[in-house]
Curated annotation (Swiss-Prot):
Biased composition, class Low complexity, residue ranges: 617-627
Misc. comment: The genome of this virus consists of three linear, positive, single-stranded RNAs encapsidated in separate virions designated RNA-alpha, RNA-beta and RNA-gamma. Three proteins (alpha-A, beta-A and gamma-A) are translated directly from these genomic RNAs and the remaining proteins encoded on RNA-beta (beta-B, beta-C and beta-D) and RNA-gamma (gamma-B) are expressed via three subgenomic messenger RNAs.
Name of the protein in its database record: Replication protein alpha-A
Domain Alphavirus-like MT: 81-305
Binding site for ATP: 838-845
Domain (+)RNA virus helicase ATP-binding: 805-969
One biological process term in Gene Ontology: methylation
Keywords: ATP-binding, Hydrolase, Methyltransferase, Nucleotide-binding, Transferase
């Protein structure tokens, strides 16, 4: 026991621990080395784990490692880093402001909370916090405010005009800001400005006191102020909070504590700033900032520190100083009006508080410093490091009287300035003191030691004399006899001091050399007399029922799991449970078969008075559809009746094809079904083939999803670095914390209407044997405007879910199930089919606009963008309201999915780009509309309908041209003269086998150019693609498009400016560059068996210039660039094609 005590005493000694650490770190073979390394590793691992769980904040500024460490120390709750991608003045102040904003926002709730940010950076909120309701009050009260507004406007324009992807909600706010600024400008010019005009969505130009922004109903209201209350009187601030119904607000401001004890100027070390008190105002400025500083009223500024109670007309607020971080004071202001009522009820008449403001740490001391000023001695006080002063005092105490020397002391102080000796080594610590202060400190310590030695000698002499003789009567009674009252003594001292000054003598105060501790805090007392007034604030109710249910469910799952594990370990399973064990799985399967179809049917049924339960009626759910493929109107509510449906494999394995609705089960793969039998009616054959094509598409898409699930099961998808087919994302309920596996999808990657729900029952070699179930289920997403949440509402909380490209809309499945019923009732009937066969740019859409009686006829389009454009043109020209336009101008998918009153009726309808879709789909449109006449717009020379299912051949995808009325249009308003000549020379357009001449109204004569291996301006790889922002880029293949996007988007080209030829059909652009990046032959490349339509579409999208860039000299390049090609043909040859 004694030895243990000795060891503990030794270890507690600083020099022993230093030697131990030195030995352990220098001697690798020492056992202490392993112990030290293990301990350090444990500490590092602990720090890493804590850092992972912390919120990551990138301050972005270019700062030093010491400054970054200061930020980390000030905000330990964040994992602070810097990408060093920005630079500017007062960088540390900017970094602290960013972290202060995050810290204040973390103090307030997120869900259904409206935050006023007084004077906040609205663009920063708009860019980084688009998911929160934050409104900034940014009035223009000075020239600097106007400059700050324009700076933020420029930053917004720079970001919005950049190449990065942006959420849709950001675009909406961007447009609103520009509209609001235009309205404000108009109001100022007209002299009709008021608070309503200055209001805005993202920010307003009113002061916080005058802000009129309406808060969404049911939202909690709060406010933050990041360095913005300096010029707002605390009484006005509290009154504004009361008017807006804000019960608690948070803020922060720069605060040098020394200003409370009268220090007129000083530094703000954390932000590298300074403050100066002058003429009743306090000024702040920064060391490395040449810009204008900030000046504020000192009295109003100090009220935020000195006051605890803020008395206003209709209530009382209390200010709580929470903490100091760096040079910033955080505060909280709370509505405490309710306390007045409570205290009045209890008979209390007043309330009193005190608070202590910390000033300085105990690491410094106040030292008197001496200097000459105009031939007189000047004494000042300095705040110097305690360590340096104590080291200097200890050093001079060791010297003998004859060795006392100011020069030696200065030498020593200079050597130990901001350092001390530890374990035989010099350790740097603190801030280095200036040389002039070192010199003054040496004089002070020298004089102090002289005076102290004199005092010590006097004390010793006194006691020596007293101890040499015995006390007598005089010694005993002398003090009593010569007693002088304090009043007379004081008078004598004053007379003595005056006489000495009269004769030129000075009385020296021996306490002048004393070194004192500085003031550590300032105590502030505040009192308030209880007066009952104002109204008591009430809080907003937030419905957190779902979160509570989820918590209880997780707790129940934990308890059930613990009980089952304990029963399995102890073997305490009851006999009844053992007997029921074999029956559990069959019972589950029966319940699924009985309950799930009814549930899915109810969720998918179209909304009607007889169907009270649908997806919209579920609280908190919002059906979502793709913004590129769905319609705005009510017909987009896709439904799928499950009753009477069968799995795909049951239809596919039959000998003869019988169309029947498909259910959601996809737990088995299957081959393609047999083709439908051919009848004598071309139109009926087309209908049957379109249904067959839709069925094959569903089978193919589901097989692709099962392949992705198979990759997931075999751990081929094991991290977010792996490129997942179909852009699939997996969500798991297998753990206690459900969530996305590997990677959370971004806001642009969500919005799927369906997901595949699956789980595994065994670990087998075959996927179908391993699956417990696998089915398609509807899901919903929370929406706010165009913003979509990243986690959907799943119908069940177990197993796995996968969303991918094939579950975005599932239109093939929905359309097939809709048309099965239509096909069963349809009969062959005569239809008049007229085709307007026009060259590119002949005005087919304009012809629809001019010839269609939209109130009696219907317009159907193949693509969403073209149909939307056509609908808007109808609304402008025919003065249609939105409801009528949405009802009678439809996309193909929208019409085929519609039911009941959502389907318009018409004897005749127009079909834009009819040859890009299957002829059977057009027949079904006629059946649903009840039409007998079809006026179709198309171009037989351009791209036809493309079969997306491999392994099947379509025979009835085009109209029966022998029974079709064909009306050719050979005049274009788009293509230049050389393109018209080229289309005519290559005989792309014929009428009854006779080549036709294509003409154009475009005055541009030469537009076709080419670059290849042998051209003067060579093109051999992707790196040779010219970068132009006013150009649209085309490719033949999707793989080429992706390569082009990865090369051009980082260089400023927009994503929308790159597409395949098939995607660009119907589009018009001024300048076009067509790129071929693969040398290997392909049937759609120029010269291939299917290349003609691609050449026609690719060369006819432009109005000014077309450049073909190919890595090989194919047919199109030779047609343009070869000797005798278009590029060398005289311009006068093209003039005959221009009218």
């Amino acid at each position: 026991m004694a030895s243990d005590e000795i060891v503990r005493n030794l270890i507690s000694r600083e020099e022993v621990m230093g030697n131990l650490i030195s030995t352990a770190s220098s001697s690798v073979r020492s056992p202490l080395h392993d112990v030290l390394c293990s301990h350090v590793r444990t500490i590092v691992d602990s720090v890493d784990k804590k850092a992972v769980s912390r919120k990551h904040e990138d301050v972005r500024r270019n700062i030093s490692s010491e400054e970054l460490q200061m930020l980390i120390n000030a905000y330990p709750e964040y994992a602070v880093s810097s990408s060093a991608c920005e630079s500017g003045t007062h960088s540390m102040a900017a970094c602290f402001r960013f972290l202060e904003t995050e810290y204040l926002l973390d103090m307030v709730p997120m869900k259904e909370t409206f935050v006023y940010d007084i004077g906040g950076n609205w663009f920063s909120h708009m860019k980084f916090r688009a998911d929160r309701e934050i409104h900034c009050c940014c009035p223009i009260l000075s020239m600097r405010d106007s400059e700050r507004l324009e700076t933020r406007m420029m930053a917004m324009q720079k970001y919005m005009r950049g190449s990065k992807d942006k959420p849709l909600r950001l675009l909406s706010r961007y447009q609103n800001i520009l509209r609001e600024q235009a309205a404000r400008t108009t109001a100022f010019m007209a002299g009709e400005v008021n608070a309503g005009v200055l209001d805005g969505d993202v920010f307003c130009e009113n002061t916080f006191q005058d802000c009129v922004r309406r808060v969404p109903e049911g939202f909690l209201k709060t406010a933050i102020a990041v360095h913005s209350i300096y010029d707002i009187k605390v009484e006005e601030f509290a009154s504004a909070l009361k008017r807006k119904g804000i019960t608690q607000a948070y803020g922060c401001f720069l605060f040098p504590p020394a200003v409370l004890i009268g220090q007129k100027e000083g530094i703000l070390p954390s932000v590298d700033g300074h403050y100066l008190v002058e003429n009743g105002r306090i000024k702040f400025f920064f060391a490395n900032d040449p810009n204008a500083g900030y000046s504020h009223d000192l009295k109003d500024y100090l009220k935020y520190v000195e006051k605890t109670y803020v008395d206003i007309e209709d209530g009382v607020f209390a200010i709580e100083l929470m903490q100091m971080r760096g040079d910033t004071m955080f505060f909280k202001i709370t509505d405490v009006t309710a306390a007045m009522y409570h205290m009045k009820y209890r008979g209390m008449k007043r309330d009193e508080t005190f608070k202590c403001i910390p000033l300085l740490k105990n690491s410094s001391v106040v030292v008197p410093l001496f200097s000459w000023d105009n031939r007189s001695l000047k004494i000042t006080s300095g705040l110097l490091p305690r360590t340096l002063v104590e080291q200097g005092a200890a050093f001079i105490m060791k010297n003998k009287e004859k060795d006392l020397n100011v020069a030696v002391l200065k030498n020593y102080l200079s050597a130990v300035n901001n350092s001390y000796i530890f374990n035989g080594s010099q350790v740097r610590d603190g801030v280095k003191i200036a040389p002039d202060l070192i010199s003054k400190l040496a004089v002070t310590l020298y004089l102090r030691e002289k005076v102290y030695r004199q005092r010590e000698n006097s004390i010793i002499s006194y006691f020596e004399q007293e101890m040499l003789h015995d006390p007598n009567l005089k010694a005993m009674f002398g003090d009593f006899l010569w007693f002088v009252p304090n009043t007379l003594s004081s008078v004598w001292k004053n007379m003595r001091k005056s006489l000495m000054e009269w004769f030129g003598y000075a009385e020296f105060d021996l306490t002048t050399f004393d070194i004192c501790d500085p003031v550590l805090y300032v105590e502030i007392v505040d009192r308030y007399k209880i007066i009952q007034k104002g109204r008591i604030p009430l809080g907003e109710f937030f419905d957190c029922h779902e979160e509570c249910e989820n918590y209880e469910l997780r707790e129940k799952e934990k308890n059930d799991l613990a009980v089952k594990m304990a029963q399995k370990v102890t073997g305490t399973v009851t006999e009844c449970e053992k007997d029921l064990g074999p029956l559990v799985q069959p019972i589950k399967e029966i319940l699924v078969q009985l309950v799930m179809p009814n549930l899915v049917r109810a969720l998918c049924r179209p909304r009607s008075p007889t169907s009270p339960l649908d997806l919209k009626s579920i609280p908190g759910s919002t059906p979502s559809h793709s913004s590129s493929d769905s319609e705005h109107s009510m017909t987009e509510e896709a439904s799928c009746t499950i009753a009477g449906s069968v799995p795909t494999w049951e239809i596919a394995t039959r000998k003869d094809l019988t169309f029947q609705r498909i259910d959601e089960d996809m737990s088995r793969r299957t081959g393609m079904p047999p083709r439908p039998k051919v009848t004598s009616s071309y139109n009926m054959n087309a209908r049957a083939e379109f249904l067959y094509y839709q069925l094959c598409s569903v089978i193919c898409e589901r097989a692709q999803i099962l392949s992705v699930i198979e990759d997931f099961r075999q751990n081929l998808i094991f991290s977010d670095k792996v490129a997942v087919p179909l852009n699939a994302r997996f969500y798991s309920f297998q753990s206690l914390r459900p969530g996305w596996v590997f990677k959370t999808p971004s806001h642009s990657e969500v919005g799927h209407s369906y997901a595949v729900h699956f789980d595994f029952k065994t670990i087998g070699t075959d996927l179908e044997e391993s699956l417990a179930f696998c089915r398609m289920v509807p899901i919903s997403w929370d929406k706010s405007g165009k913003y979509i949440a990243t986690t959907p509402h799943f119908p069940e909380r177990h197993g796995y879910y996968v969303i991918c490209d094939n579950t975005k809309l599932c239109n093939n499945w929905l359309i097939y199930n809709k048309l099965v019923d239509v096909y069963a009732l349809v009969a062959d009937r005569p239809l008049r089919f007229e085709l307007i066969d026009g060259v590119p740019g002949c005005g087919k859409s304009t012809m629809i606009l001019n010839s269609c009686d939209i109130r009696r006829e219907v317009v159907v389009g193949e693509g969403r963008n073209a149909t939307d454009d056509l609908r808007e043109r109808f609304k402008r020209k025919k003065n249609l309201n939105s409801k009528t336009a949405n009802h009678r101008v439809r996309t193909l998918d929208s019409l085929l999915l519609a039911e009941g009153p959502c389907v318009p009726q018409a004897d005749r309808f127009h079909f834009d780009e009819a040859l890009k879709v299957h002829y059977g789909a057009i027949m079904f449109c006629a059946d649903k509309l009840g039409a007998s006449e079809i006026l179709a717009q198309g171009d037989r020379a351009q791209l036809p309908m493309i079969c997306r299912v491999e392994g099947i051949e379509l025979q009835f995808q085009s109209p029966d041209y022998t029974k079709t009325i064909i009306n050719p249009k050979l005049r274009s308003y788009r293509i230049p003269g050389d393109v018209a000549f080229y289309l005519s020379a290559k005989e792309f357009y014929k009428v009854k086998g006779i080549p036709q001449k294509v003409i154009t109204s475009n005055s541009v004569k030469r537009s076709l150019y080419a670059r290849g291996e042998t051209t003067p301006e060579r093109f051999v790889s992707l790196l040779d693609v010219p970068v132009r922002k006013d150009t649209h880029y085309l490719t033949f293949l999707q793989a080429e498009k992706e390569s082009l996007m990865s090369h051009l988007i980082p260089k400023g080209v927009k994503k929308e400016s790159i597409s395949t030829i098939h995607e660009a059909q119907g589009g018009t652009y001024e300048n076009v560059i067509l790129v071929r990046l693969q040398r290997t032959p392909n049937e759609i490349y120029p010269g291939g068996p299917r290349s003609a339509p691609y050449i026609v579409v690719g060369t006819s999208r432009h109005t000014k210039t077309f450049t073909y860039c190919s890595v090989t000299d194919d047919k199109l390049l030779l047609d343009i660039a070869d000797v005798g090609g278009i590029a060398h043909t005289p311009i006068r040859t093209f003039e005959s094609h221009i009218v």
